[in-house]
Amino acid sequence: MKDLINNSIKHHSEALQLIDESVIINSASIVLDAIKKGKTIFWCGNGGSASQANHLSAELIGGMYQKKINPFKSICLNVDSAFITAWSNDDSFNNIFLRQLEALGA
């Protein structure tokens, strides 16, 4: 068990070294700029990433500040299970988020 944990830590540490921090900084700047301009942030994900997207969207709406500031415009596209299952059945799973963005005028 100890070897498994140590190997996991080693692999995660190696993966962290490969991250280009400029990509993270650029992404954060894009999100912050959109928030400052009053634009809506759209989130989406698949599987566990869908849960992450939902959480991030909820935080922007107000969870992280508990009403100390105005909420930010934030929509998580993967929470509409009725649409996702209907559209992927009737059309294609490949463009479920695109279709929602078209409907929302984004």
Residue ranges of each PLM-predicted region?
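Generic N-terminal amphipathic, Lys/Arg-enriched alpha-helix
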Residues: M1-I19
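Hydrophobic packing residues in well-ordered alpha-helices of helical domains and bundles
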Residues: I5, I24-S27, A53
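Generic structural microfeature
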Residues: N7, N26, D90-S92
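A short, well-structured juxtamembrane/interface segment
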Residues: I19-K37
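Glycine-rich, small/polar surface segments that engage phosphate groups of diverse ligands
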Residues: D33-G105
